[in-house]
Curated annotation (Swiss-Prot):
Residue interval(s) of motif JAMM motif: 179-192
GO molecular function: metal ion binding; metallopeptidase activity
Keywords from the named record: Hydrolase, Metal-binding, Metalloprotease, Protease, Zinc
Binding site for Zn(2+): H179, H181, D192
Family: Belongs to the UPF0758 family.
Alphabetized SUPFAM superfamilies for the sequence: JAB1/MPN domain, RuvA domain 2-like
GO BP term, pick one: proteolysis
Protein name, as recorded: UPF0758 protein TTE0897
UniProt domain MPN: residue ranges: 108-230
Length: 233
């Protein structure tokens, strides 16, 4: 689209308007900015919806800016406001839920890569550490995935009581621990290994086996079991 992006979208040639392009060709042909423009619906007095969308996802920011930003932070951007910010966050959350419902339902875990692939896009851009528990039945199929804590991972924040309460309520046979490193580097810290040790020991007492601890970075993940950081047997 080589037109001046400050002109109103309705003044663009019919075949260049994002909504009409989506109807005719499908969503896969639209740019990220065009898809965002459809979500926010309108621009501002200064710029149209496409120009506004491009400002949101500059090369430095990318799509992860929308994922990581709060409603308030998005709303403070000129031309966005509360209504558009809420639409954007709702779209992100729907995408996250759809991904989990289609990939997680009756999903059998056969390797650490299964968990990494399942949670990578949800967790790779998070600005804080999120500690999750993947709960499995006796056939290693996912029952549920629950966020236990948000913040720097340490033994005071991740308490066995909270971890295994969720697993017991779901009648889980075993669990896999998962958390992200906002730095993008999934290499385990000493604290990561200490948390793992504590939870494995608690699981052995309760009869709920901790199978692994997976750390998500930016585009790659690490299994503490696979890499030999801790003996889960």
């Amino acid at each position: 689209m080589g037109e001046d992006l400050n002109i109103r979208i309705k003044d663009l040639p019919y075949e260049e308007r994002p909504r009409e392009r989506l109807i005719k060709y499908g969503p896969q042909v639209l740019s990220n900015a065009e898809l965002i423009a459809i979500i926010i619906g309108t621009g501002s007095r200064r710029e149209n919806a496409i120009s506004l969308a491009q400002k949101l996802i500059t090369e430095e920011r990318g799509l992860k800016f929308i994922v990581n930003s709060s409603v308030e932070k998005l709303a403070n951007i000129r031309g966005i406001g509360i209504a558009k910010a809420v639409k954007l966050k709702a779209a992100v959350e729907l995408g996250r839920r759809l991904m989990l419902s289609t990939q997680g339902e009756n999903f059998s875990v056969t390797s650490p890569e299964d968990v990494i692939n399942l949670l990578m896009e949800e967790m790779r851009y998070l600005s804080k550490e999120h500690f999750k528990v993947v709960m499995l039945n006796v056939k290693n199929k996912i029952i549920a995935i629950e966020t236990i804590s948000i913040g720097s991972l340490n033994t005071s924040i991740v308490h066995p009581r909270e971890v295994f309460k969720a697993a017991i309520e779901r009648s889980a046979s075993s669990i896999i621990l998962v958390h992200n490193h906002p730095s993008g580097d999934p290499t385990p810290s000493r604290e990561d290994v200490e948390v793992t040790k504590r939870l494995v020991e608690a699981g052995n007492i309760l009869g709920i086996k901790v199978l692994d601890h997976v750390i998500i970075g930016d585009g790659r993940g690490i299994s503490l079991k696979e890499k030999g950081y801790y003996d889960f047997e």
